[in-house]
């Protein structure tokens, strides 16, 4: 394998680790960095990603098996970047290459509008033009930046709340699909808030130090 390819794989492995590694109740740093650039609440971007591709540690271990001895298994459920959804069925893979190879086969059998890819499950039919290639669609940071861009656009269309923007992210036409999706995102947000409050109490013992996740009203 060429030296450049090895370097690329190493950098990508570091990126995935950044997106998975955090305290049990923290939002991983990678999501915070991307969200800040786009003016999206980090908790919203993370909750959307959880809704799209969440995997429990045991499920991640099952996918990875013994393919990467250096991979650090997260202690809690995290979004998984090597995910494809085809016609409503999800597929998880151990590496970017495996996911990309599977996608090439799916694209010969299904229209792009029936395929979602990556850590934030961006639909290739509606938003594939936002990627330079199908390979790029599996880069976790490119996927998250794309998702944050779409969320920002949805927020402008739905200025009442970020929850409505999340529903738009899943189903721009609204209706029952958006409502169901929003309910799942809300559950993730509420859990994140509870966990953050619990952590603050354990570390500080001060209710005044509780983090305030602003995901219903606009963030000033």
Name the predicted role of every residue range.
Residues 1-43, 183, 187-220:
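N-terminal secretory targeting signals
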Residues 23-195:
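Catalytic glycan-binding domains that act on GlcNAc-containing polysaccharides
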């Amino acid at each position: 394998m060429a030296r450049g390819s090895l370097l690329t794989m190493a950098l990508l492995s570091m990126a995935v680790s950044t997106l998975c590694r955090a305290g049990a109740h923290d939002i991983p740093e990678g999501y915070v960095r991307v969200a800040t650039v786009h003016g999206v609440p980090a908790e919203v971007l993370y909750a959307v990603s959880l809704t799209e591709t969440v995997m429990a540690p045991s499920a991640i271990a099952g996918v990875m098996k013994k393919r990467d001895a250096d991979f650090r298994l997260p202690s809690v459920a995290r979004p998984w970047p090597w995910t494809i959804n085809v016609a409503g069925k999800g597929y998880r893979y151990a590496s970017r290459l495996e996911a990309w190879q599977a996608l090439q086969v799916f694209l010969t059998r299904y229209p792009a509008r029936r395929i979602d890819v990556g850590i934030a499950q961006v639909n290739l039919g509606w938003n594939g033009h936002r990627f330079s290639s199908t390979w790029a669609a599996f880069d976790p940071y490119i996927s998250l930046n794309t998702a944050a861009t779409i969320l920002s656009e949805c927020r402008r269309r739905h200025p009442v709340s970020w929850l409505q923007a999340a529903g738009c992210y899943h189903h721009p036409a609204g209706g029952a699909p958006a409502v169901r999706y929003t309910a799942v995102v809300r559950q993730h947000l509420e859990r994140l808030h509870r966990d953050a409050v619990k952590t603050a109490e354990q570390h500080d013992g001060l209710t005044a130090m509780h983090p305030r996740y602003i995901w219903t009203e606009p963030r000033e």
